[in-house]
Amino acid sequence: INVIRYGMTRNWILGLRVVTGSGDILNLNKSLVKNNTGYDFRHLFIGSEGTLGIIYEATLQLTEPPKPSTVCVFGVEKFAYLIEVLKICKSMLQVNAFEFFCNNALSRVVGAHQYQRPFDTESPFYALVELENTEIETETVFEVYSKCVDEKLITDGVISQSIDQARALWRLREDISETLWHFQPYKNDISVRISKMADFSNDVSQLIQKNYP
């Protein structure tokens, strides 16, 4: 969820100890931050799920725990507008996370858990943005909101005013999988270039409507 801020988990793995199928023990990268010597086999083993060997030890890089967060949810009329909102947020804010969900998913979550909708008006899509709750970021997020409204990218929005409200807004996104599991949906974790996401979403929607009317 926090890839925008922290990157992928693999980027935080400084070293691995691995047992291969032949019983050899490999010490990969030796916990070095900078290592330009030869092939970096560490990244071959990350995600290999045991096919190349058994990882029995990992050294992870740590960082300071994040400060309390401010969470925003914006209503968006078109999928393509989500990309523009993301660009504005990244250019003006230190974004921790950026997620989106559709109104169908939101309606299921709200109905199943008796949650409150983020605001009265409904939109086809919603953008959820998380940032650190600092004075500068909090002031800037209102500028982001105004800019997105002026450019007609969002129709409505809410900015959390407390930790409890921030958690409640996250629940709207995080509880989607739990809410939909008994419908037995087809689920995939697919990576798509940001520039191709609008086209991908449109193509998938047309394919689903054609095959599952």
Question: How does the language model describe each region?
Answer:
Residues 1-99:
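FAD-binding subdomain of flavoenzyme oxidoreductases
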Residues 64, 70-213:
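C-terminal substrate-recognition/cap domain of FAD-linked oxidoreductases
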